A protein has these predicted regions:
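Thiamine diphosphate
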Residues: 49, 107-171, 175, 205-223, ...
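Short beta-strand segments
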Residues: 62-65, 103, 117, 142-143, ...
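Conserved acidic/glycine
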Residues: 1-47, 54, 235-236, 241-385, ...
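Conserved small/polar residues in nucleotide/adenosyl-binding loops
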Residues: 464-470
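Short beta-alpha connecting loops at secondary-structure transitions
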Residues: 175-180, 200-205, 250-260, 285-286, ...
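Cofactor-binding active-site loop characterized by glycine-rich and histidine/acidic residues
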Residues: 23-27, 33-163, 181-187, 192, ...
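Cofactor-binding beta-sheet edge motifs in enzyme active sites
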Residues: 340-341, 445-463
Length: 474
């Protein structure tokens, strides 16, 4: 598929901006300026740049610990990125997120995750919100080859398939999960062909080839927006720096292997050679583009070094939302006595009637009405999209609820039995409890998790959950 001159230029600008910024951050990490880990995207720039060139601010992306490139390609200013890694108040998350937790929802950057897997589920949640709100945009999780051996990958693809979510799963197979070769860690030697097992489109492409990426993402976008068909795209690529700055790099691979990718398969060199071969840009024009970016990154770096740290007095800001600030629980003309089941059913019905952003999801809550009849009749009244029966995958649908809340919906998670929430602890503790804080309040978390347990039936010590930070248990 042909790409126009201006679009090619934009892709190249994104790619070189990522490369220059990452090299600058790598040096800064060596000098101790980066607070925390620093995982660079060097060698993989073609994927983020080409994919994000086809998106707008309403298309949502969810990234990984190696997320600088996706953030920049989506439109994050280098100054905000560098500031965030330096822990400065001028960072995109006001210094609370750091390298692995970058947020700017106004441009569709919904966050990066230091934990492998959750962003896949969150992207499914955003896809669910898109369908709920009848929008025509897409949700895209970027993840590495290591994530495909994680349960979140299976649960995410399955949910996207059965609910026709407009999600494009992009696996950046850079050959190593930290230092473990993909050839060792996976029984299946490819990722793209796994899509067909879930009833979705699957592609295996060269992740360093701008033209192949462009052709595939255009097709996947068409399927997602017009037909609500999810896709899985495996981009085969290679990171040419260590897993994280400061880590030993040549115990599990050789310098010769790395240099082969740096010289012969570098995506930036490939597109530069294409420009020269096709006479799209000459050496002087390419240098001018690079010089402009070099100057911008240098200025951003210096400004970030000089920027202030957050005030100590703000350390606990954004831990909680303002609780019931605009509500009046006493504004009722009459009262009645009900048991917990009846009261839950009445409140769900009342709130769903007045707020179409609310949906309920859980096992057996549809026509069956749930184990304790708390949703009985709501399926017929509000439909399958708002009263959603789920597979048995607590981690999966709680992670989806997290992403749905991040993107504007108000999910109510209904656990068949409350002790089943143990299976979703990772999503509750590492994601739901922390996203609002790490995003400096840019992303809210209007999510309710509820469930019942039979009287006299001891299955778990639920009160231990009271010790979880940022959670309110009723």
């Amino acid at each position: 598929m042909k790409i126009g001159k201006e679009k090619l230029k934009n892709i190249f600008i994104k790619m070189y901006t990522i490369r220059k910024c990452e090299e600058t951050l790598a040096k800064a990490a060596q000098q101790g300026l980066v607070l925390g880990a620093c995982h660079t995207y060097v060698g993989q720039e073609a994927i983020a740049a080409t994919v994000c060139e086809e998106l707008d601010n309403h298309d949502l992306i969810f990234s990984t610990h190696r997320g600088h490139g996706h953030a920049l390609a989506k439109g994050l200013d280098p100054f905000e990125l560098i500031s965030e890694l330096f822990g400065k108040k001028t960072g995109c998350s006001k210094g609370r997120g750091g390298s692995m937790h970058l947020f700017k929802p106004e441009i569709g950057l919904m966050g990066t995750s230091g934990i492998v897997g959750p962003n896949i589920l969150q992207a499914c949640g955003a896809g669910y919100s898109i369908n709920l709100f009848k929008k025509n945009n897409v949700s895209i999780p970027f993840f590495g080859d290591g994530a495909v051996n994680n349960g979140a990958f299976h649960e995410g693809l399955n949910m996207a398939s059965i609910w026709n979510l407009p999600v494009i799963f992009i696996c950046e197979n850079n050959q190593f999960a930290t230092e473990v070769p993909f050839s060792y860690s996976s029984g299946s030697k490819n990722v793209g062909n796994r899509g067909f097992n879930y009833g979705i489109e699957g592609y295996e492409i060269d992740g360093n080839d701008v033209f192949e990426i462009h052709k595939t993402i255009k097709l996947a976008l068409k399927n997602a927006k017009e037909k609500k068909i999810p896709s899985l795209i495996e981009c085969k690529t290679y990171r040419t720096r260590s897993h994280a700055e400061g880590m030993i790099d040549y115990t599990y691979r050789t310098k010769g292997e790395v240099n082969k990718w740096r010289s012969g398969k570098c995506p930036i060199l490939k597109i530069e050679n294409y420009f020269l071969e096709k006479k799209i840009f000459n050496d002087k024009e390419i240098k001018k583009i690079k010089d402009t970016i070099d100057q911008k990154i240098a200025i951003s770096y210096q400004k970030a070094k000089e920027a202030p740290f957050p005030e100590k007095s703000t350390a606990l800001d954004f831990v909680f939302s303002d609780y019931c600030k605009n509500s009046n629980t006493n504004n009722h003309s009459s009262t009645s006595q009900k048991n917990m089941i009846q009261a839950t059913h009445e409140v769900l019905d009342y709130e769903m009637k007045r707020n179409d952003k609310i949906f309920i999801l859980g096992e057996g809550i549809g026509k069956r009405g749930g184990n304790f009849s708390t949703t009985l009749g709501l399926f017929e009244k509000y439909g399958q999209l708002r009263v959603c029966d789920t597979p048995i995958c607590e981690r999966g649908f709680v992670g989806l609820a997290c992403g749905a809340a991040m993107s504007g919906a108000r999910p109510v998670v209904d656990f068949m039995f409350i002790d089943f929430l143990n299976d979703a602890f990772g999503e509750i503790i590492n994601q739901i409890s922390k996203v609002q804080y790490m995003s400096s309040g840019k992303i809210k978390m209007p999510i309710i998790m509820r469930g019942c347990i039979g009287i006299g039936h001891s299955a778990a010590v639920s009160y231990t959950h009271l010790t979880l930070p940022t959670n309110r248990e009723v």
